Curated annotation (Swiss-Prot):
SUPFAM superfamilies: beta-lactamase/transpeptidase-like (SSF56601). Disulfide bonds: none annotated. Pfam families: Glutaminase. It comes from Alkaliphilus oremlandii (strain OhILAs). This is Glutaminase. InterPro entries: Beta-lactam/transpept-like, Glutaminase. Coiled coil: none annotated. Gene3D superfamilies: DD-peptidase/beta-lactamase superfamily (3.40.710.10). Belongs to the glutaminase family.
Length: 305
């Protein structure tokens, strides 16, 4: 497997030049555009890695999967989906167009920014400090990495430039989708997106979902399996933004991307996969990372369809 992974990475490196680093979060322009790596964690305990698998990046929108599960655990699916929909939009991840023109005025799904902000606003806690601590503790539990932390420079960069997210949040507050203090909820959202990870960390999140919420180390079921299935279904239909349909056809596994260049993928009952490639395509997905997953899926026949 090791040789095959190295070969797949090398065959996709040429795509890096055709992508770009995101510019709307200034700190993300400091990323190494040429980085490309993969980490695979399997339910039988075996692990495979290649390339820049230890490269550190911020989790960004991949965090939306975890906060969705937390909100579902806190409130149950019926209430959460009164506040956010389940359908793909076909629009860019940061688009606010349908939020205003479609009734009822709620975000289409939890994987776009508006939906994720609404979901994060539902995470329970008596104070902002308790809420971010709950998020960090759950991330550490699922990844098995007690050293996870927020990248402060990315967090401050996102907070200072997040005007579009701020506009969406205040609109959702106005129509009753978001409860509580808008700036407090946005601050929580910016922090969750700025958690620094490696391919191994997001592969472990994928592994957790592949077992429907069982921790590999303990064999303990720590979430409702139904909530894991909901997350994977939404990853399949909405996780790669407005390229989700194409990804489902070409790769065929649940996945969630982030503008930090990461992609977290799940092969149900088998493995979790973490890929990093900061150079993004026009949809906001890792341009080489998508190619790597497509080749890997074909080689190992991973498609769930």
């Amino acid at each position: 497997m090791q040789i095959e992974l190295e070969k797949i990475l090398n065959q996709n490196r040429e795509k890096i030049a055709f992508g770009n680093l995101p510019t709307y979060i200034p700190e993300l322009t400091r990323a190494n555009k040429d980085a490309l790596g993969i980490y695979i964690s399997q339910l039988d305990g075996s692990e495979f890695k290649a390339g820049d698998y230890d490269y550190k990046f911020t989790i960004q929108s991949i965090s939306k999967v975890i906060t969705l599960i937390m909100a579902l655990e806190d409130w149950g699916a019926e209430y959460i989906f009164e506040c956010v929909g389940k359908e793909p939009t076909g629009d860019a991840f940061n688009s606010m167009m349908k939020l205003e023109i479609v009734r009822p005025s709620k975000p289409f799904n939890p994987m776009i920014n508006a939906g994720a902000i609404a979901v994060t606003s539902k995470i329970k806690g008596k104070s902002p400090e308790e809420r971010i601590q709950r998020i960090m503790d759950f991330f550490k539990l699922v990844t098995g990495n007690p050293d996870l932390k927020v990248n402060e420079s990315i967090y401050m960069s996102e907070k200072s430039t997040g005007d579009r997210n701020r506009a969406m949040a205040y609109f959702m507050k106005d129509v009753g989708v978001i409860t509580g203090d808008v700036e407090e909820n946005l601050d929580l959202y910016f922090k969750q997106c700025s958690i620094e990870v490696t391919c191994k960390d997001i592969a472990r999140i994928g592994l957790f979902l592949s077992s429907d919420g069982v921790l590999l180390e303990t064999g303990k079921q720590i979430i409702n399996p139904k909530h894991s299935k909901i997350a994977k279904a939404l990853m399949t239909t909405c996780g790669m933004y407005n390229a989700s349909g194409e990804f489902a056809i070409n790769v065929g596994i649940p996945a969630k991307s982030g503008v930090g260049g990461g992609i977290m993928a799940v092969v149900p009952g088998k493995m979790g996969i973490g890929v990093i490639g900061p150079s993004l395509d026009e949809k906001g997905n890792s341009i080489a990372g998508v190619g790597v997953l497509e080749q890997l899926s074909k080689m190992l026949e991973l498609s769930i369809f």
